[in-house]
Amino acid sequence: MSKVGELHDAVKRGDIATLTALLEADPGLANARSEADARGTFPLHVAAEFGQAESARVLVRNGADVALLDLENDAIALCWAAFFGRPGVVSALLDAGSDVNQRNKHGLTPLGCAVGGTRGQGQKFSNATLDDWRKAAEMLRAREGKE
């Protein structure tokens, strides 16, 4: 497995020790796009999808760019966190300055992604509860997020 693959795997599992060691050895990995994921994800997108808030914080502290867009939807990681109902990651990304009103290629903001996530598609791929989506949406609204 490549170093990028190892990093993405550590983020997905929430393996902070491995994540930290990989970033110390190569800080550029914080913004390394996956070669294996056709969606074109970056480490913050992986943290968002799998609800790994501490991984997101470690990545941000090590230079991860919260404005990077995936290839599939031109979406920032905040939109992914909202879509998958991950309030801990939403909080971490908001604290890092992620744009609460950045639209993806479908015209959805992170708040729109949170609302969309509760309407079936996000629920297919996430173990989040409706309360998780509500919390994420409330955080986005509190930062003046628009749909």
Annotate each PLM feature.
Residues M1-E6, A96, V115-E147:
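Ankyrin-repeat-protein effector appendages
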Residues S2-L7, R33-P43, L69-I76, R103-G116:
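Ankyrin-repeat boundary/"N-cap" motif
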Residues D9-G14, V46-Q52, W80-R86, C113-N127:
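Ankyrin repeat A-helix N-terminal signature
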Residues T18, E54-S55, G88-V89, D132-A136:
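Conserved ankyrin/ankyrin-like repeat signature
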Residues L23-L29, R57-D65, S91-D99, E138-K146:
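Ankyrin repeat domain, specifically the short helix-to-loop turn at the C-terminus of the second helix
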Residues T41, E49, D131:
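Ligand-binding pocket scaffold of soluble enzyme catalytic domains
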Residues A75-G122:
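Ankyrin-repeat and related helical/solenoid repeat scaffolds used for protein-protein interactions
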